[in-house]
């Protein structure tokens, strides 16, 4: 073999070695690139999971805020209803003596006297108008004559034996009671049969 042939053979061997080294380098590079991609995928998956958890947390926070808003709105509406419903309580309580006095005037007036008769009719009309006006605002009269005694609506002044009335029934109403929107403003003062 000549030098030239040796050289050609050596060059071919060197080329094969270079190609082999290049292929090994490609394999190593591909493996490291694959490892890098897997690490990147794992990192992205972790970021995705964290983002999903954060979104779920934000959705939960929004739902809680909406529920709290609804609760606040409902409580405010209830408070307004209560205020509207019972705003007249003190005012109505102050009107009760006026009603009592008009009723006393009718009871004590001389119905036989012609001059007083016209006055009593005027007082009676005034009382009726007054009662119908306050009833529009939820004030109702408790007049339990002949009814069974109810401690929630009646205040017993005393008990008295009576053959004309059943036991535990109201036989005399000393002072009428009043409720405002189903809440007792003043119980009726009564005498109860034994």
From Swiss-Prot:
Membrane-crossing segments per the record: none
Gene3D superfamilies for the chain: 3.90.20.20, Head domain of nucleotide exchange factor GrpE
InterPro entries (UniProt xref): GrpE, GrpE_coiled_coil, GrpE_head
Single GO biological process annotation from the record: protein folding
A GO MF label: unfolded protein binding
Disulfide bonds: none
Key words of the record: Chaperone, Cytoplasm, Stress response
Main subcellular location: cytoplasm
Location in or out of the cell: Cytoplasm
GO annotation, cellular component aspect: cytosol
Stated family: Belongs to the GrpE family.
HAMAP family: GrpE
Function: Participates actively in the response to hyperosmotic and heat shock by preventing the aggregation of stress-denatured proteins, in association with DnaK and GrpE. It is the nucleotide exchange factor for DnaK and may function as a thermosensor. Unfolded proteins bind initially to DnaJ; upon interaction with the DnaJ-bound protein, DnaK hydrolyzes its bound ATP, resulting in the formation of a stable complex. GrpE releases ADP from DnaK; ATP binding to DnaK triggers the release of the substrate protein, thus completing the reaction cycle.
Oligomeric and partner information: Homodimer.
Protein name according to UniProt: Protein GrpE
